[in-house]
Amino acid sequence: LGVFAYLLSKRKGKDEIVEQRLRQNTLKIADEIVSKSGKDLYRRPFERYYWGCNGTLARLTVNLFVADKLNPDKKYKNTAYDTVAHIFGRNYYNRSFVTGLGLNPPMNPHDRRSGADNIIDPWPGYLVGGGHSAIDWIDEEGSYSHNEVAINWQAPLVFALAWLLN
């Protein structure tokens, strides 16, 4: 985030060489995200699955946002849309990874507030971590490695949604 703040800052006196390198690297990474998305059946911008990978997907949209600010190109926003679509149900499981939203959302996040309130539906709006492989996700409260919720995953998802709605 510090790199992005530096790049988007209007502050005078920034080091031009540092700014140029950061700009080039940011655009290169964003272009790699776009390329990887184009190679995936579900337009998911990376191949690996691991604990919290949905949070990584959400964070990639921040990279795409900054790239779009530096070098406006619809490919960045389109890839962000595809990434969010994956999170909300355009995926192998044909279901959303956000409680209360999207297609067939998770019902059993690893979250004490949702699990202990004696209400069937979980608190809405939580992004859960996701599977460890394309076909390995289970909707069980006790499965923290699949269904954990974390603030550092929620924040970039909210950011992505705000950008895409703007």
Question: Could you say what each language-model-derived stretch is?
Answer:
Residues 1-39, 47-166:
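Aromatic (Trp/Tyr) and acidic
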